[in-house]
UniProtKB/Swiss-Prot annotation:
Belongs to the YqgF nuclease family. Pfam families: RuvX. Its EC number is 3.1.-.-. This is Putative pre-16S rRNA nuclease. It comes from Pediococcus pentosaceus (strain ATCC 25745 / CCUG 21536 / LMG 10740 / 183-1w). The lineage of its organism: Bacteria, Bacillati, Bacillota, Bacilli, Lactobacillales. It is found in: Cytoplasm. It is an enzyme of class 3 (hydrolase).
Amino acid sequence: MRLMGMDVGSRTVGISVSDQLGWTAQGVEIVPINEDEEIFGIERVKELVKEYDVVGFVLGLPKNMNNTEGPRVEAARNYGKLLEETFGLPIDFQDERLTTVEAERMLIEQADTSRSKRKKVIDKLAASLILENYLNGHGKLIDRLK
């Protein structure tokens, strides 16, 4: 049993999963979506939920630096509702401020990755950081792993 972390954007969803003990998170893939056309990648998410035996979702909440909520927060909450309705599994949110910036910094400094390569993995790495922060903060869904 694992938790699935998600970095929800308007065109992609970065996906990560925890290990079975809830200690670490690893990036899995980036699922293409299109909010304007109401294509949310749910079929692929269904496959991943089954493959990894997911028991709950942790979505990044992209609050503004002053802690206010903008339109992307609403989009993340709506995606969470869609997941809850589709899977009947619990969801929780993790403040994701600066996770994409941190992911990009890691790719530049530690992996010396080119801009084109960074673009292909950044959402997956951001999802991993979101879930890792959640696990380290002992979020309420961690008990579901036991």
